[in-house]
């Protein structure tokens, strides 16, 4: 039978509950426990698929095609365990399910209420993850902050959960902030006390407190916090600001988090194997020469909009002993100032996914610059589509070529709507989503990087390369290096005679891991290193990846 851990947050939002959940998952897995992690989000959207990246950040896509919160990316990267649509729950999806049941008559004419029906649905979702994942421990992160109206049904549900499984089979962790007041020179505990008081008023007594701080927390202060909050001093866990999120599991391990959680759950504290993770963090902290990577996007004002792309670049840099010098380049700014100006001195260019017209011309200009100046280039999803448009206009002689998404009346729709999308009306959850196979062409850059004939990648798109133009592209020098197994859909393209120019319709960033970077990203960083004096790139490639158990 599974054990359950619930993680709440107080004082401020964005306090790092997702990283705590992912880190605890890593620590439990290092002790031999199977782990699954789910996120309860208090917003009324059914999923984040139609939300603006400026409001929500990246949409992370699971293997089974769920559009989810970016925290699921952290869960997968830290635990190297695939999550599913069951691991992402929103208030909107809960209410949708309950209302559908009411319409079907499942409640036999009863009055449908927040308690017990909404809270019961939430509890059922948590139990479903446990039964489907065969996890020894299910970790649940509750989004939002204690005290928010939106979070109340979730907090009530996890309080009720205690009656479902018994007090010895679950643990409550509360993540809070200790602000430092410069004028008094003190860390203040009162916000934490009030946050725990609010949590206790709901009926939840935390077993462990994780205290975020930018400086050391004294033993006296830990005793004070524990005394006021009803938590043993040893269970007051400091979590100081770290230089990397990948250092957080090591910090929490040193502070005894996993030991305390296992004690509450009555589980054995097996020996931990974090040696490979320590090696990874050590490489991250002691990199080789830096590579300048330009990320050309539409949403660069919010870094979280491209979180998995940035992490994938970091993973590749760790493997290649490189320091990531990331330059955020606004695609619209390129339209104003020119690609040659804004991309001068870059060792590689990445154009990630996106939607809509805004910034597209800037992306096309960046791709042309990378192609003509032989700068390593990687395009992802819309990045591949804009690479196709750039080639069509500037090399294949197709004046006015573009995507049907951007201009329905274009004379040359080199990118067009997938046939199965023709009659789709709803926006949410209707794209080509999840894992699909891709057959790699022999003798290509892609084959060298992947080393496999068939690979499986995650998708999120409605538009695809228009096969009416495939022969023209092939004749003009384009290489189709990856297709669907039936050869119908173009999934991966590259250019001959260029140091590194490839683009894919899928999202490889979702499969990159700290100890196992995605081949396309590692290839990009290797190519970027080739532009450095005395490049060590090829020798480093032969070292292989860090095997994290």
Swiss-Prot record:
<feature type="binding site">
    <location>
        <begin position="148"/>
        <end position="150"/>
    </location>
    <ligand>
        <name>CTP</name>
    </ligand>
</feature>
<feature type="binding site">
    <location>
        <position position="405"/>
    </location>
    <ligand>
        <name>L-glutamine</name>
    </ligand>
</feature>
<dbReference type="GO" id="GO:0042802">
    <property type="term" value="F:identical protein binding"/>
</dbReference>
<keyword id="KW-0547">Nucleotide-binding</keyword>
<dbReference type="GO" id="GO:0046872">
    <property type="term" value="F:metal ion binding"/>
</dbReference>
<dbReference type="InterPro" id="IPR027417">
    <property type="entry name" value="P-loop_NTPase"/>
</dbReference>
<dbReference type="GO" id="GO:0044210">
    <property type="term" value="P:'de novo' CTP biosynthetic process"/>
</dbReference>
<keyword id="KW-0665">Pyrimidine biosynthesis</keyword>
<dbReference type="InterPro" id="IPR004468">
    <property type="entry name" value="CTP_synthase"/>
</dbReference>
<dbReference type="Pfam" id="PF06418">
    <property type="entry name" value="CTP_synth_N"/>
</dbReference>
<protein>
    <recommendedName>
        <fullName>CTP synthase</fullName>
        <ecNumber>6.3.4.2</ecNumber>
    </recommendedName>
</protein>
<feature type="domain" description="Glutamine amidotransferase type-1">
    <location>
        <begin position="292"/>
        <end position="534"/>
    </location>
</feature>
<dbReference type="GO" id="GO:0003883">
    <property type="term" value="F:CTP synthase activity"/>
</dbReference>
<feature type="region of interest" description="Amidoligase domain">
    <location>
        <begin position="1"/>
        <end position="267"/>
    </location>
</feature>
<feature type="binding site">
    <location>
        <position position="71"/>
    </location>
    <ligand>
        <name>ATP</name>
    </ligand>
</feature>
<keyword id="KW-0436">Ligase</keyword>
<keyword id="KW-0460">Magnesium</keyword>
<feature type="active site" description="Nucleophile; for glutamine hydrolysis">
    <location>
        <position position="381"/>
    </location>
</feature>
<comment type="subunit">
    <text>Homotetramer.</text>
</comment>
<feature type="binding site">
    <location>
        <position position="71"/>
    </location>
    <ligand>
        <name>Mg(2+)</name>
    </ligand>
</feature>
<feature type="binding site">
    <location>
        <begin position="382"/>
        <end position="385"/>
    </location>
    <ligand>
        <name>L-glutamine</name>
    </ligand>
</feature>
<dbReference type="GO" id="GO:0019856">
    <property type="term" value="P:pyrimidine nucleobase biosynthetic process"/>
</dbReference>
<keyword id="KW-0067">ATP-binding</keyword>
<feature type="binding site">
    <location>
        <begin position="14"/>
        <end position="19"/>
    </location>
    <ligand>
        <name>ATP</name>
    </ligand>
</feature>
<feature type="binding site">
    <location>
        <position position="224"/>
    </location>
    <ligand>
        <name>UTP</name>
    </ligand>
</feature>
<comment type="similarity">
    <text>Belongs to the CTP synthase family.</text>
</comment>
<dbReference type="InterPro" id="IPR017456">
    <property type="entry name" value="CTP_synthase_N"/>
</dbReference>
<dbReference type="InterPro" id="IPR017926">
    <property type="entry name" value="GATASE"/>
</dbReference>
<dbReference type="GO" id="GO:0004359">
    <property type="term" value="F:glutaminase activity"/>
</dbReference>
<feature type="active site">
    <location>
        <position position="507"/>
    </location>
</feature>
<keyword id="KW-0479">Metal-binding</keyword>
<feature type="binding site">
    <location>
        <position position="224"/>
    </location>
    <ligand>
        <name>CTP</name>
    </ligand>
</feature>
<dbReference type="Pfam" id="PF00117">
    <property type="entry name" value="GATase"/>
</dbReference>
<keyword id="KW-0315">Glutamine amidotransferase</keyword>
<feature type="binding site">
    <location>
        <begin position="188"/>
        <end position="193"/>
    </location>
    <ligand>
        <name>CTP</name>
    </ligand>
</feature>
<dbReference type="InterPro" id="IPR029062">
    <property type="entry name" value="Class_I_gatase-like"/>
</dbReference>
<feature type="binding site">
    <location>
        <position position="141"/>
    </location>
    <ligand>
        <name>Mg(2+)</name>
    </ligand>
</feature>
<feature type="binding site">
    <location>
        <position position="354"/>
    </location>
    <ligand>
        <name>L-glutamine</name>
    </ligand>
</feature>
<dbReference type="GO" id="GO:0005829">
    <property type="term" value="C:cytosol"/>
</dbReference>
<feature type="binding site">
    <location>
        <position position="462"/>
    </location>
    <ligand>
        <name>L-glutamine</name>
    </ligand>
</feature>
<dbReference type="InterPro" id="IPR033828">
    <property type="entry name" value="GATase1_CTP_Synthase"/>
</dbReference>
<feature type="binding site">
    <location>
        <begin position="188"/>
        <end position="193"/>
    </location>
    <ligand>
        <name>UTP</name>
    </ligand>
</feature>
């Amino acid at each position: 039978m599974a054990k359950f851990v619930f993680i709440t947050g107080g004082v401020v939002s964005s306090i790092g509950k997702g990283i705590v959940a992912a880190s605890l998952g890593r620590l439990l897995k290092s002790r031999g426990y199977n782990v699954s992690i789910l996120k309860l989000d208090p917003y009324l959207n059914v999923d984040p698929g139609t939300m603006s990246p400026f409001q929500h950040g990246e949409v992370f896509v699971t293997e089974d095609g769920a559009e989810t919160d970016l925290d699921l990316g952290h869960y997968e990267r830290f635990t190297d365990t695939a999550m599913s649509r069951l691991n992402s729950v929103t208030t909107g999806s809960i209410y949708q399910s309950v209302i559908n049941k009411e319409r079907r008559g499942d409640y036999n004419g009863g009055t449908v209420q927040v308690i017990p029906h909404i809270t019961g649905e939430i509890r059922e979702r948590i139990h479903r993850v446990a039964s489907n994942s065969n996890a020894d421990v299910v970790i649940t992160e509750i989004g939002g902050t204690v005290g928010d109206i939106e979070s109340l049904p979730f907090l009530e549900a996890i309080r009720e959960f205690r009656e479902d499984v018994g007090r010895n089979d679950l643990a409550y962790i509360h993540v809070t902030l200790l602000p430092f007041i410069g004028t008094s020179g003190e860390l203040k505990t009162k916000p934490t006390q009030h946050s725990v008081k609010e949590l206790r008023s709901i009926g939840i007594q935390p077993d462990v407190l994780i205290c975020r701080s930018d400086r050391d927390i004294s033993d006296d202060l830990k005793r004070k916090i524990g005394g006021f909050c009803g938590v043993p001093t040893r269970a007051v866990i400091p979590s100081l600001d770290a230089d990397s999120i990948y250092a957080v599991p090591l910090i929490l391990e040193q502070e005894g988090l996993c030991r305390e959680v296992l004690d509450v759950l009555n589980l054995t504290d097996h020996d931990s194997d974090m040696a490979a993770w320590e090696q990874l963090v050590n490489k991250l902290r002691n990199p080789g020469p830096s590579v300048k990577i330009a990320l050309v996007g539409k949403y660069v004002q919010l870094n979280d909009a491209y979180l998995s792309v940035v992490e994938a670049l970091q993973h590749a840099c760790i493997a290649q002993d490189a320091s990531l010098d990331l330059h955020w380049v606004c695609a619209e700014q390129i339209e104003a100032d020119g690609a040659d100006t804004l991309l001068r001195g870059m060792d590689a260019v990445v154009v990630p996914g996106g939607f809509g017209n805004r910034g597209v011309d800037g992306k096309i200009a960046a791709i042309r610059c990378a192609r003509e100046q032989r700068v390593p280039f990687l395009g992802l999803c819309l990045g591949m589509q804009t690479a196709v448009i750039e080639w069509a206009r500037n090399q294949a002689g197709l004046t006015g070529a573009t995507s049907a998404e951007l201009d329905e009346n274009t004379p040359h729709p080199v990118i067009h709507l997938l046939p199965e999308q023709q009659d789709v009306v709803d926006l949410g959850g209707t794209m080509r989503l999840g894992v699909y196979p891709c057959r790699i062409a022999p003798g290509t850059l892609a084959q060298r990087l992947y080393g496999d004939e068939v690979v499986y990648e995650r998708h999120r798109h409605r538009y695809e390369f228009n096969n009416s133009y495939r022969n023209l592209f092939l004749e003009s020098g384009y290489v189709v290096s990856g297709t669907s197994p039936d050869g119908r859909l173009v999934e991966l393209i590259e250019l001959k005679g260029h140091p590194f120019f490839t683009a894919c319709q899928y999202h490889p960033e979702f499969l990159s891991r700290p100890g196992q970077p995605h081949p396309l990203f590692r290839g990009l960083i290797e190519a970027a290193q080739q532009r450095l004096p005395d490049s060590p790139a090829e020798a480093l490639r032969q070292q292989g990846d860090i095997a994290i158990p």
